[in-house]
Amino acid sequence: MANGFYRNHTSKNDYKHTGVLGEIGVGYYKPLDDDPFILEAYIGGGMGTVSKSEVLTNGSESRTATFDARAAKLFIQPQIGYASRFFDMALSPRFSLVKYTNFSSSNYTQAELANDYLDNGKLTDKPFAFAEPTVTVRVGYKWLKLQAQYGLTINIGGGNIRHPDNFSSLGVVVDIAQWYHE
């Protein structure tokens, strides 16, 4: 299993947010006795970066404030689903730990950092734990399928951190083993 994420968001008011994450994992796949139902489990990790730049104004004065951080991630992803030649659907209660390192910021006040939970080393102090329940749907033929995924992101430990409440993705799945054995 290999996943990648890239986001580059710029808004009209001089706000820019970027993020990159790469993940790799290994997994186990087993058809259940009631074929076409399957059980899958993955474990893996990843690394990434996040940065933000924004122009803040106070009356007639303005300043550009920035922050950057690196992150490491570990995850476990059990999954139960239905698989056929043309359609797959799965439910997964994915769990992940994210540890931020190398945090740096400039031109933010202590109050602004505290508002984003970035003050006093809170971001890099300990790992954050997340539950990420997910629904995955795949449509295609045999070893090549289009995948759509939707999930929630729930902070279950490690303290307060700003994060999105949900996520979605669209991608292509290539089952190399099935392709090879055809």
Enumerate the language-model features and the residues they cover.
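Glycine- and aromatic-enriched membrane insertion/assembly motifs of diderm outer-membrane
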Residues: 1-52
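Outer-membrane beta-barrel transmembrane domain signature
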Residues: 45-169, 173-182
